Amino acid sequence: MKKTVVVFSGGQDSTTCLIQALEQYDEVHCITFNYGQRHKEEIEVAQRVSQLLGATAHKVLDVSLLNELAISSLTRDNIPVPDFKQSEQSDIPSTFVPGRNILFLTLAAIYAYQIGAESVITGVCETDFSGYPDCRDEFVKALNHAVNLGIARDIQFITPLMWLDKAQTWALADYYGKLDFVRHNTLTCYNGIQGDGCGQCAACHLRERGLHGYLQDKNAVMDAMKNKVGLK
């Protein structure tokens, strides 16, 4: 029986990963982290979406200790969330939560170890990403190697979206017939607004630009996505 663990926030990327995983694995376990994020709606949305899609199980872990160390506009009400133009002007935006993916992937691997899952799936990507160093392919591979050494188990970190742009990520959701579901039920917005979001923050801008790009040339984007992912 094939099992996997999806690092799940209830946003566009992790939901698309969950949709694909449900087609590929016998058991799909979601893990969501409460790290004191600015908008608790994220956790509620993640729980609702995983249930609607039919995940095998959904674990929510309290990692609020991260909030004590990682100062970010996603964890502090007194730090404003930058709009897209402000984010573009910074090498690492204030929305970056230092150590977040280090912690999340490590804990997800421990959970995978306990339930006998062969892999951990995460929706990080280098294309159209927000300048976060812990979304890079080299980081994920390096951490995967270190974690496997530490637990003496071969658990694979899988990044289905690593080389897809946002338009192609929308195409992947559409390939599985879930574009409208992802658009209306997920929460990607840094300001905590479900669906199409606030339209001002970097996350909303990338999401909307990707959707527009896909809808403008669906066939070409779909073909490009299939070639990258290896779908027919």
Curated annotation (Swiss-Prot):
GO terms (BP aspect): queuosine biosynthetic process
Gene3D superfamilies per UniProt: HUPs
InterPro entries linked: QueC, Rossmann-like_a/b/a_fold
Reactions listed under catalytic activity: 7-carboxy-7-deazaguanine + NH4(+) + ATP = 7-cyano-7-deazaguanine + ADP + phosphate + H2O + H(+)
Keyword Metal-binding: yes
Record keywords, A-Z: ATP-binding, Ligase, Metal-binding, Nucleotide-binding, Queuosine biosynthesis, Zinc
Xref: Pfam families: QueC (PF06508)
EC number: 6.3.4.20
Residues reported to bind Zn(2+): C189, C198, C201, C204
Cystine pairings recorded for this chain: none
SUPFAM superfamilies reported in the protein's UniProt record: Adenine nucleotide alpha hydrolases-like
Protein name: 7-cyano-7-deazaguanine synthase
Lineage, broadest ranks: Bacteria, Pseudomonadati, Pseudomonadota, Gammaproteobacteria, Enterobacterales
